[in-house]
Amino acid sequence: MLLLPLLLLGVILPGGDNEDVFQGPTSFHLKQISTFVNSTWAQNLGSGWLDDLQIHGWESDSGTAIFLKPWSKGNFSDEEITELVDLFRVYLIGFIREVQDRVNEFQLEYPFVIQVIEGCELHSGEAIESSLRGALGGLDVLRIQNHSCMPAPDSGNRGQKLCALLSQYQGTSDIIERLVSETCPRYLLGVLDAGKAELQRQVKPEAWLSSGPTPGPGRLLLVCHVSGFYPKPVQVIWMRGKQEQPGTQQGDIMPNADWTWYLRVTLNVAAGEAAGLSCRVKHSSLGDQDIILYWGHPTSIGLILVAIIVPSLILSICLALWFWRRWSYQNIL
């Protein structure tokens, strides 16, 4: 564990260059969703995530892990991965059995869903923080951190009973503590290094403007679309000159299939006030060259004309050359 701070510096500051700040994910979490339909049917779903990027899946029928990226194993050996997969398989089977045996004790009513999330997160200049959280139907029940189990404030007796139950299974508690405090930080540093070519890439966004559904008489909904960017942090602002416009509404940043992101930012304005507005996009891949799109700017019409005229001109030149060569060949004959 004493080597972790040095490894952390190697991941965040590759090559020891303070200017080369890590731009990719900083956390890894395993997510478990266990659905209990009745006393005889239950199902486990599992996945592994670097921030919002999924790199693992879980095949519940066969009890095997699915590695979604070539580097998803990090720097763990095949033997270590096999040991961990076997451990999770046994845990998930035992988890369902244990919960079904204690439905009455914890006053649970079918159907219900239990969620568990465990993982660790890098904090620049600080230690790696690890934790495990459990929830019932979306409401927190307990949290395990710093070698202690803490009931959630609104969990009532359930959180206290679960923490008391875990304290009776010292072997299980020790395994959880080792996975969260030791295995997870080591895996996180290894997978960030193994996948750094993809995780630290910079992909420039594409941006375009459109109008949305009419919000009311005499009103316009201006929409600024930004897509295909990576990493996730981005700033999109509707502006008039250098003044940010109030009333800007930003949607959720949504994932694309290629691990890039999409964002939609809208502004509701009076139809007569749309002229002179612009959408500014700031992203790390752009440096200080922000994308600025002007609503109804003449440049947009000019670009459309260029897009039509240039291909037509090229086609005309090609046809002229073809007729000239054919005419020359006939004259020779």
From Swiss-Prot:
Residues 21-302 are extracellular. Its main location: membrane. Keywords: Adaptive immunity, Cell membrane, Disulfide bond, Endosome, Glycoprotein, Immunity, Immunoglobulin domain, Lysosome, Membrane, Signal, Transmembrane, Transmembrane helix. A motif (Internalization signal) lies at residues 329-332. Antigen-presenting protein that binds self and non-self lipid and glycolipid antigens and presents them to T-cell receptors on natural killer T-cells. This is T-cell surface glycoprotein CD1b-2. Residues 324-333 are cytoplasmic. GO terms for cellular component: endosome membrane; external side of plasma membrane; extracellular space; lysosomal membrane. Glycans are attached at N38, N75, N146. Disulfide bonds join C120-C184, C149-C163, C224-C279. One of its GO terms (molecular function) is lipopeptide binding. Residues 185-295 form the Ig-like domain. It comes from the Eukaryota. The chain crosses the membrane at residues 303-323.
